[in-house]
């Protein structure tokens, strides 16, 4: 198991997640249903044990019931639950959550990318109810498996199953995805969090823009609050969104809160309002795509 995959943000925020209170905003109800393309859920419960490698698990629970309250307060109707890395490949809590609260949630699972059985595991998890798989190749040598022989079978299996490949990786790794995308022309590929491109390295974003030549690549508009060096509404990070919007169009951008990771920096309400209210270069139709219709393309919400 590649321990370098365990991104520091996904482990470090457990204690921070209560740092910023969330409040219900004032907003106009849109004519479309708002879809959050990524959250995580977890619970401290012996029925769902933490992975052995998770040395400092979050002490505060972050459950679907808690999320539903935020969704209702902010006018969000559907959400994608991505498997929390603290459970590694044990996807049961995410699966039980999407089943319990159907049809509100859809789920994205994790499989071990260095396990030759990963494609078959993905098939099984898809049959059980997941729609998508997430991988996280690290920037260092520990993430070099992205260029290894086990990746094409996993990507091709996702393509044959008709489920998206979700990739959370730093901007320096983005060029490594091109050969896999080219091998799977009918696979939807979702790049998480704008690849966390630093705002002080705008030329690095060219690597992400280069993937716009592939028509099934989608970009999550998220993590503005962590890459930004400014207060809300994070205008320096908005410049990344502006450039991605010019390259991909709104039809291939989709919003995600990344709750509860966001709570270490901001609120769920602001993670949404920055797109809905404060990106002045977006018109109403653009927002309907980024906040709703693009996600509908990737995840078949009922």
Where are these regions (language model features)?
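Mid-domain alpha/beta scaffold segments of enzyme catalytic cores
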Residues: 21-153, 157-161, 199-202, 235
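Active-site metal-binding loops of divalent metal-dependent hydrolases
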Residues: 39, 84, 194, 258-259
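N-terminal cationic-hydrophobic initiation segments that often serve targeting/anchoring roles
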Residues: 71, 98-102, 181-182, 212, ...
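Short beta-strand segments
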Residues: 81-83, 110, 220-223, 254-256, ...
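Short Gly/Pro-enriched loop/turn and capping motifs at secondary-structure junctions
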Residues: 224-226, 259-262
């Amino acid at each position: 198991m590649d321990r370098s995959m365990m991104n520091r943000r996904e482990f470090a925020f457990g204690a921070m997640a209560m740092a910023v209170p969330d409040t219900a905003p004032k907003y106009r109800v849109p004519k479309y249903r708002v879809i959050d393309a990524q959250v995580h859920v977890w619970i401290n419960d012996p029925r769902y044990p933490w992975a052995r490698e998770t040395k400092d698990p979050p002490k505060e629970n972050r459950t679907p019931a808690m999320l539903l309250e935020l969704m209702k307060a902010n006018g969000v109707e559907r959400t994608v639950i991505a498997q929390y890395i603290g459970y590694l490949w044990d996807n049961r809590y995410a699966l039980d959550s999407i089943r319990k609260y159907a049809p509100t949630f859809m789920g994205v699972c994790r499989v071990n990318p260095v396990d030759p059985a990963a494609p078959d595991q993905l098939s099984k998890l898809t049959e059980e109810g997941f729609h998508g798989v997430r991988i996280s190749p690290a920037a260092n040598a520990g993430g070099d498996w992205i260029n290894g022989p086990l990746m094409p079978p996993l990507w091709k299996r996702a393509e044959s199953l008709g489920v998206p490949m979700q990739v959370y990786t730093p901007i320096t790794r983005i060029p490594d995805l091109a050969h896999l995308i080219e091998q799977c022309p009918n696979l939807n590929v979702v790049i998480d969090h704008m690849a966390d491109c630093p705002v002080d390295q705008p030329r690095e974003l060219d690597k992400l823009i280069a993937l716009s030549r592939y028509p099934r690549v989608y970009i999550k508009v998220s993590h503005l609050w962590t890459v930004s060096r400014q207060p809300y509404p994070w205008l320096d990070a908005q410049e990344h969104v502006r450039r991605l919007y010019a390259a991909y169009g709104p039809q291939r951008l989709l919003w995600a809160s990344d709750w509860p990771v966001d709570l270490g920096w901001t609120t769920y309400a602001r993670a949404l309002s920055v797109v809905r209210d404060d990106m002045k270069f977006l018109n109403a139709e653009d927002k309907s795509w980024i906040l709703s219709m693009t996600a509908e393309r990737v995840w078949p919400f009922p």
